[in-house]
Amino acid sequence: RISAKHYGIPSTGNGRRESFRQMPIPRMRATYMEAGNVTEEEMISTVKKGIYASSFTNGQVQIGAGDFTFFVKDGYLIENGKLTQPIKDINIIGNGPRALADITMVGNNYKMDNGTWTCGKDGQSCPVTCGMPSALVSKLTVGGEN
């Protein structure tokens, strides 16, 4: 409630804690995106130069501003609509609300994650879930390049 009041928004009940030993703090718990109507292959075919991220690791978000950074654990370079060479350990930087506005296509391949994600905050770690289809984001900073 304190954070919601600080940001001037309604409370959403996202106060969670790792165990009874800690105070609850606001944090993520579940992230989902509804499936669209295009295949992954159709999305990839529209990209002149970009990356296809197969999996992510080590993300951070600046609450309030919405700025984020994630590392692509593994994926592929996209060149002229085709997956070419493998990539890994690439940094992606962006802003959450802006990235959502820059989604140009959403795939029909919705799936739930394997459940290995956690939300780390103030020395606590809580399990979180996410599920989504592939999504084409037109503008993000990748490895320091826009």
Question: What does each model-identified segment do?
Answer:
Residues 1-146:
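N-terminal small-residue-enriched
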